[in-house]
Protein backbone atom coordinates (compact mmCIF):
# COMPACT_ATOMS: atom_id res chain seq x y z
CA UNK A 1 0.00 0.00 0.00
CA UNK A 2 2.79 2.41 0.93
CA UNK A 3 4.52 1.70 -2.39
CA UNK A 4 1.30 2.52 -4.26
CA UNK A 5 1.00 5.89 -2.50
CA UNK A 6 4.62 6.68 -3.17
CA UNK A 7 4.17 5.92 -6.86
CA UNK A 8 0.98 8.01 -6.98
CA UNK A 9 2.68 10.98 -5.32
CA UNK A 10 5.63 10.63 -7.68
CA UNK A 11 3.32 10.72 -10.72
CA UNK A 12 1.52 13.81 -9.34
CA UNK A 13 4.85 15.56 -8.74
CA UNK A 14 6.02 14.81 -12.29
CA UNK A 15 2.76 16.07 -13.78
CA UNK A 16 2.88 19.24 -11.67
CA UNK A 17 6.44 19.90 -12.79
CA UNK A 18 5.51 19.41 -16.42
CA UNK A 19 2.61 21.86 -16.09
CA UNK A 20 4.91 24.47 -14.54
CA UNK A 21 7.41 24.11 -17.38
CA UNK A 22 4.67 24.46 -20.00
CA UNK A 23 3.25 27.54 -18.27
CA UNK A 24 6.68 29.17 -18.17
CA UNK A 25 7.20 28.68 -21.90
CA UNK A 26 5.99 31.72 -23.89
CA UNK A 27 3.14 30.96 -26.25
CA UNK A 28 4.21 31.64 -29.81
CA UNK A 29 1.66 33.70 -31.64
CA UNK A 30 2.02 32.94 -35.33
CA UNK A 31 0.14 34.30 -38.33
CA UNK A 32 -3.00 32.34 -37.40
CA UNK A 33 -3.27 34.16 -34.07
CA UNK A 34 -1.79 37.59 -34.80
CA UNK A 35 -2.03 37.95 -38.56
CA UNK A 36 0.85 39.49 -40.48
CA UNK A 37 2.84 39.15 -43.67
CA UNK A 38 3.68 35.92 -45.48
CA UNK A 39 6.40 36.08 -48.15
CA UNK A 40 8.41 33.71 -50.30
CA UNK A 41 11.89 34.70 -51.42
CA UNK A 42 13.57 32.90 -54.32
CA UNK A 43 17.35 32.91 -54.71
CA UNK A 44 18.76 33.14 -58.22
CA UNK A 45 22.18 31.74 -59.25
CA UNK A 46 24.69 34.11 -60.83
CA UNK A 47 24.74 32.05 -64.01
CA UNK A 48 21.91 30.09 -65.55
CA UNK A 49 22.30 26.42 -64.78
CA UNK A 50 24.38 26.97 -61.63
CA UNK A 51 23.27 25.21 -58.45
CA UNK A 52 22.90 27.17 -55.21
CA UNK A 53 24.63 25.26 -52.43
CA UNK A 54 23.37 24.81 -48.87
CA UNK A 55 26.05 27.08 -47.43
CA UNK A 56 24.84 30.01 -49.53
CA UNK A 57 21.21 29.36 -48.63
CA UNK A 58 22.06 29.12 -44.93
CA UNK A 59 23.95 32.40 -45.18
CA UNK A 60 20.92 33.99 -46.87
CA UNK A 61 18.66 32.80 -44.05
CA UNK A 62 21.06 34.16 -41.41
CA UNK A 63 21.12 37.62 -43.01
CA UNK A 64 17.32 37.69 -43.33
CA UNK A 65 16.97 36.58 -39.72
CA UNK A 66 19.26 39.42 -38.55
CA UNK A 67 17.26 41.95 -40.56
CA UNK A 68 13.96 40.81 -39.10
CA UNK A 69 15.36 40.81 -35.57
CA UNK A 70 16.69 44.30 -36.24
CA UNK A 71 13.19 45.68 -36.78
CA UNK A 72 11.88 43.95 -33.67
CA UNK A 73 9.45 41.42 -35.16
CA UNK A 74 8.71 38.78 -32.52
CA UNK A 75 7.87 35.14 -33.29
CA UNK A 76 9.00 35.46 -36.91
CA UNK A 77 9.68 32.43 -39.11
CA UNK A 78 12.53 32.24 -41.63
CA UNK A 79 12.96 28.78 -43.10
CA UNK A 80 14.25 27.10 -46.22
CA UNK A 81 11.75 25.66 -48.69
CA UNK A 82 13.06 23.42 -51.45
CA UNK A 83 16.46 24.11 -52.98
CA UNK A 84 16.32 27.86 -53.51
CA UNK A 85 13.37 29.36 -51.66
CA UNK A 86 12.89 30.87 -48.22
CA UNK A 87 9.53 31.19 -46.47
CA UNK A 88 9.17 34.22 -44.21
CA UNK A 89 6.35 34.85 -41.74
CA UNK A 90 6.14 38.18 -39.92
CA UNK A 91 3.38 38.13 -37.28
CA UNK A 92 1.84 41.46 -36.35
CA UNK A 93 3.07 43.28 -39.48
CA UNK A 94 0.33 44.89 -41.57
CA UNK A 95 2.43 47.03 -43.93
CA UNK A 96 3.41 44.75 -46.81
CA UNK A 97 5.45 47.49 -48.50
CA UNK A 98 7.56 47.99 -45.39
CA UNK A 99 8.19 44.25 -45.16
CA UNK A 100 9.27 44.07 -48.81
CA UNK A 101 11.64 47.00 -48.32
CA UNK A 102 13.34 45.15 -45.49
CA UNK A 103 13.36 41.66 -46.99
CA UNK A 104 13.97 42.17 -50.68
CA UNK A 105 16.83 44.66 -50.74
CA UNK A 106 20.30 43.32 -51.36
CA UNK A 107 21.80 46.14 -49.23
CA UNK A 108 25.16 46.06 -51.01
CA UNK A 109 27.18 49.06 -49.82
CA UNK A 110 30.13 50.14 -51.96
CA UNK A 111 32.67 52.95 -51.81
CA UNK A 112 33.86 54.20 -55.21
CA UNK A 113 35.69 57.19 -56.61
CA UNK A 114 33.53 59.38 -58.86
CA UNK A 115 35.15 61.42 -61.64
CA UNK A 116 34.17 64.94 -62.77
CA UNK A 117 31.71 63.46 -65.28
CA UNK A 118 29.88 61.44 -62.65
CA UNK A 119 31.37 58.12 -63.74
CA UNK A 120 32.09 55.59 -61.02
CA UNK A 121 35.36 53.73 -60.67
CA UNK A 122 35.84 50.21 -59.31
CA UNK A 123 34.67 49.21 -55.85
CA UNK A 124 37.32 50.10 -53.28
CA UNK A 125 35.51 48.98 -50.14
CA UNK A 126 32.21 47.28 -49.31
CA UNK A 127 29.78 47.12 -46.43
CA UNK A 128 31.60 44.05 -45.18
CA UNK A 129 34.12 46.47 -43.66
CA UNK A 130 31.47 48.07 -41.43
CA UNK A 131 31.39 47.40 -37.71
CA UNK A 132 28.11 49.18 -37.07
CA UNK A 133 25.74 51.77 -38.49
CA UNK A 134 23.27 53.95 -36.64
CA UNK A 135 21.00 56.92 -37.20
CA UNK A 136 22.49 60.35 -36.58
CA UNK A 137 21.75 63.93 -37.53
CA UNK A 138 23.63 66.43 -39.66
CA UNK A 139 24.41 70.09 -38.96
CA UNK A 140 20.92 71.14 -40.04
CA UNK A 141 19.18 68.37 -38.09
CA UNK A 142 18.64 66.17 -41.14
CA UNK A 143 18.68 62.38 -40.56
CA UNK A 144 21.80 60.58 -41.72
CA UNK A 145 23.53 57.26 -41.13
CA UNK A 146 26.71 57.32 -39.11
CA UNK A 147 29.03 54.36 -39.55
CA UNK A 148 32.09 52.89 -37.91
CA UNK A 149 34.41 50.43 -39.61
CA UNK A 150 36.21 47.37 -38.36
CA UNK A 151 39.95 47.86 -37.70
CA UNK A 152 41.04 46.47 -41.08
CA UNK A 153 38.34 48.49 -42.82
CA UNK A 154 39.45 51.66 -41.04
CA UNK A 155 43.02 51.17 -42.26
CA UNK A 156 41.84 50.71 -45.84
CA UNK A 157 39.46 53.68 -45.59
CA UNK A 158 42.33 55.88 -44.40
CA UNK A 159 44.48 54.75 -47.33
CA UNK A 160 41.69 55.37 -49.85
CA UNK A 161 41.01 58.88 -48.58
CA UNK A 162 44.72 59.69 -48.31
CA UNK A 163 45.39 58.70 -51.92
CA UNK A 164 42.32 60.44 -53.34
CA UNK A 165 42.30 63.88 -51.69
CA UNK A 166 40.38 66.35 -53.87
CA UNK A 167 38.28 63.63 -55.50
CA UNK A 168 34.68 62.64 -54.83
CA UNK A 169 34.08 59.48 -52.81
CA UNK A 170 30.74 58.01 -53.83
CA UNK A 171 28.88 55.93 -51.28
CA UNK A 172 26.68 53.57 -53.28
CA UNK A 173 23.84 51.42 -51.94
CA UNK A 174 22.37 48.79 -54.26
CA UNK A 175 23.74 50.60 -57.29
CA UNK A 176 22.38 54.01 -56.32
CA UNK A 177 24.71 56.84 -55.25
CA UNK A 178 23.60 58.04 -51.81
CA UNK A 179 26.18 60.80 -51.42
CA UNK A 180 29.48 61.75 -53.04
CA UNK A 181 31.41 64.22 -50.89
CA UNK A 182 34.79 65.64 -51.91
CA UNK A 183 37.66 64.16 -49.89
CA UNK A 184 39.34 67.12 -48.16
CA UNK A 185 41.89 65.17 -46.19
CA UNK A 186 42.74 61.67 -45.02
CA UNK A 187 40.03 60.24 -42.76
CA UNK A 188 41.57 58.11 -40.01
CA UNK A 189 39.56 56.11 -37.49
CA UNK A 190 37.16 54.58 -39.99
CA UNK A 191 34.15 56.74 -39.17
CA UNK A 192 31.89 58.63 -41.54
CA UNK A 193 28.30 59.37 -42.44
CA UNK A 194 25.88 58.72 -45.28
CA UNK A 195 23.37 61.41 -46.17
CA UNK A 196 20.69 61.05 -48.81
CA UNK A 197 17.58 63.08 -47.98
CA UNK A 198 16.41 60.33 -45.65
CA UNK A 199 13.39 60.48 -43.40
CA UNK A 200 14.03 59.19 -39.88
CA UNK A 201 12.29 55.90 -40.70
CA UNK A 202 14.27 55.47 -43.92
CA UNK A 203 17.51 56.13 -42.06
CA UNK A 204 16.58 53.56 -39.39
CA UNK A 205 15.68 50.98 -42.03
CA UNK A 206 18.90 51.56 -43.97
CA UNK A 207 21.02 51.33 -40.81
CA UNK A 208 19.32 48.01 -39.98
CA UNK A 209 20.05 46.71 -43.48
CA UNK A 210 23.71 47.70 -43.22
CA UNK A 211 24.09 46.14 -39.77
CA UNK A 212 22.56 42.86 -40.92
CA UNK A 213 24.80 42.67 -43.99
CA UNK A 214 24.19 42.31 -47.70
CA UNK A 215 22.38 39.30 -49.10
CA UNK A 216 25.00 36.77 -50.25
CA UNK A 217 23.10 36.07 -53.45
CA UNK A 218 20.55 37.79 -55.65
CA UNK A 219 17.05 37.01 -54.40
CA UNK A 220 13.57 38.04 -55.48
CA UNK A 221 10.27 38.08 -53.65
CA UNK A 222 7.98 35.84 -55.70
CA UNK A 223 5.00 35.85 -53.36
CA UNK A 224 3.74 38.13 -50.62
CA UNK A 225 0.39 38.52 -48.93
CA UNK A 226 -1.20 39.88 -45.81
CA UNK A 227 -2.72 37.20 -43.59
CA UNK A 228 -5.58 37.89 -41.19
CA UNK A 229 -5.71 36.54 -37.64
CA UNK A 230 -8.16 33.75 -38.48
CA UNK A 231 -7.84 31.76 -35.25
CA UNK A 232 -7.70 34.87 -33.13
CA UNK A 233 -11.10 35.92 -34.47
CA UNK A 234 -12.79 32.63 -33.69
PLM regions: where:
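A structural signal for conserved, well-ordered secondary-structure elements
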Residues: 1-234
